[in-house]
């Protein structure tokens, strides 16, 4: 059995920017050489690229951590450190990427060669050549490199198919796919012969072509996990037309109309939007005894569920085994596809908003102040923490610069308003210092 994996959880971490360098020009005949430390190189980003040759997420079963390289440190003579190469991660077509913490959709990768930056590499820290001023012509200040983005991701593969086959097990879905395409799904006279999705390309006599997916059979209660559950129904979400295959011979003792209602209930329970897709009812096994009588009863029950002004779903009697009625079914499917647009997979609320909106709004706080049980003041906030990690705490001038930045952000004043006294401990991350009033 071929291994098929359509979900995965991974972590990605972009590379850190290289540290800037503190250096001075010391050459004969060059008095007052001045600062000469270069900037660090940028960290590598993590980029997802679509590869049409991949069919599953199997590559992510054991390799779950992806980390790009960091940029090189700045060098003397004002030379920049080398930037790190981006890490390219190949994914199959139809991969949806979500943020594991928020559940938001980051991107939907459907085209071969499509690339998306999933985690951006940090910028390189500036060398001391960048901090020279008339007041301080020989600064001993350099920045650390910026940390790269780190994310926990959920990958979900939904195969790209125009048409999806649904129905109870052993109604003939795999046989139908095998006779209308070059696909070779496993076929057997027992339930759940198909345990992974199969995909085949179908070409009609008129020259139209489309992709058809055969999904593992559903049974009543699948939405509650009975049988194989609905774990593979995600693959039908990209389809535009559903072929609902029914065993009209009732060879297993079930009523064909009850089968039809049960499967539609499972589709609706899984995702209401699946019922928006047009359905064609495929009355299979019409070469079997009692199939004609069952089809008449099926049509009568179906008509009773619709108003006289409603359009009934199209019904095509076929026999996959005897190759009967297939041409009409495929031509009708192609015509329905031609006039059916793609369906929206996600609500706007599910998507990560990457657009920028400009207008008057209250500025977000640059920092937050809390107090631990041990009476230590704790500073946090994205901007403040970013400034902190880019500060070289081994150099006094860099520390003094960071203190000025905190003062400029209003941290000192905010601490006083909260009741901080001279000598109180203040913590940023794991770094502690005394508050000086």
From Swiss-Prot:
Functional note: An essential GTPase which binds GTP, GDP and possibly (p)ppGpp with moderate affinity, with high nucleotide exchange rates and a fairly low GTP hydrolysis rate. Plays a role in control of the cell cycle, stress response, ribosome biogenesis and in those bacteria that undergo differentiation, in morphogenesis control.
Enzyme class of the recorded protein, top EC level: hydrolase
A biological process from GO: ribosome biogenesis
Known partners and oligomeric status: Monomer.
Cofactor: Mg(2+)
GO molecular function: GTP binding; GTPase activity; magnesium ion binding
HAMAP family, sorted: GTPase_Obg
Enzyme Commission number(s) of this protein: 3.6.5.-
NCBIfam families, per the entry: Obg_CgtA, Obg_CgtA_exten, PRK12296.1, PRK12297.1, PRK12299.1, small_GTP
Regions that span the bilayer: none
Positions contributing to GTP binding: 167-174, 192-196, 214-217, 284-287, 319-321
Binding site for Mg(2+): 174, 194
Repeat found in the keyword field: no
One cellular-component annotation, GO: cytoplasm
Family note: Belongs to the TRAFAC class OBG-HflX-like GTPase superfamily. OBG GTPase family.
Main location: cytoplasm
Subcellular location(s) per record: Cytoplasm
Signal peptide: none
Stretches assigned to the OBG-type G domain: 161-338
Domain (OCT) ranges: 359-437
Domain Obg: 2-160
Highest rank taxon of the organism: Bacteria
Pfam families registered for this protein in UniProt: DUF1967, GTP1_OBG, MMR_HSR1
Phylogenetic lineage: Bacteria, Bacillati, Bacillota, Bacilli, Lactobacillales
Name of this chain's protein: GTPase Obg
């Amino acid at each position: 059995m071929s291994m098929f994996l359509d979900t995965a959880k991974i972590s990605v971490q972009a590379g850190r920017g290289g540290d800037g360098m503190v250096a001075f020009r010391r050459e004969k005949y060059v008095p007052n050489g001045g600062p000469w430390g270069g900037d660090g190189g940028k960290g590598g980003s993590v980029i997802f690229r679509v590869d049409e040759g991949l069919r599953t997420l199997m590559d992510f079963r054991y390799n779950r951590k992806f980390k790009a390289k960091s940029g090189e440190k700045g060098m003397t003579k004002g030379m920049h450190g080398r930037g790190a190469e981006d890490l390219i991660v190949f994914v199959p077509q139809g991969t949806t990427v979500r943020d594991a913490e928020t559940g938001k959709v980051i991107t939907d990768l459907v085209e071969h060669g499509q690339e998306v930056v999933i985690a951006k590499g940090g910028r390189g820290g500036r060398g001391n050549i960048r901090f020279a001023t008339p007041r301080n012509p020989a600064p001993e200040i350099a920045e650390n490199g910026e940390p790269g983005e780190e994310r926990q991701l959920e990958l979900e593969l939904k195969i790209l198919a125009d048409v999806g086959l649904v129905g109870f097990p052993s109604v003939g879905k795999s046989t139908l796919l095998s006779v209308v395409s070059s696909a070779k799904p496993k076929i057997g006279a027992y339930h759940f012969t198909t345990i992974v999705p199969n995909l085949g390309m179908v070409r009609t006599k008129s020259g139209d072509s489309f992709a058809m997916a055969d999904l593992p059979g559903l049974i009543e209660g699948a939405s509650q996990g009975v049988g194989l559950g609905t774990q593979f129904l995600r693959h039908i979400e990209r389809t535009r037309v559903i072929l609902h295959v029914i065993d009209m011979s009732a060879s297993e003792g079930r009523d064909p109309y009850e089968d039809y209602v049960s499967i539609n209930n499972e589709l609706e329970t899984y995702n209401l939007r699946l019922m928006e897709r047009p359905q064609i009812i495929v009355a299979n096994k019409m070469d079997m005894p009692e199939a004609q009588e069952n089809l008449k009863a099926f049509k009568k029950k179906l008509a009773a569920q619709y108003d006289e002004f409603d359009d009934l779903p199209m019904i095509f009697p076929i026999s996959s085994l005897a190759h009967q009625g297939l041409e009409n079914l495929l031509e009708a499917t192609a015509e329905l596809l031609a006039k059916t647009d793609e369906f929206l997979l996600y609500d706007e609320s599910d998507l990560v908003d990457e657009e920028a909106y400009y207008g008057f709004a209250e500025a977000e706080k640059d920092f937050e102040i809390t107090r631990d049980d041990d009476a230590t003041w704790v500073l946090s906030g994205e901007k403040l923490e970013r400034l902190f990690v880019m500060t070289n705490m081994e150099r006094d001038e860099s520390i003094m610069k960071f203190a000025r930045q905190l003062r400029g952000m209003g941290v000192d004043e905010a601490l006083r308003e909260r009741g901080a006294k001279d000598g109180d401990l203040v913590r940023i991350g794991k770094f502690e210092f005394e508050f000086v009033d």
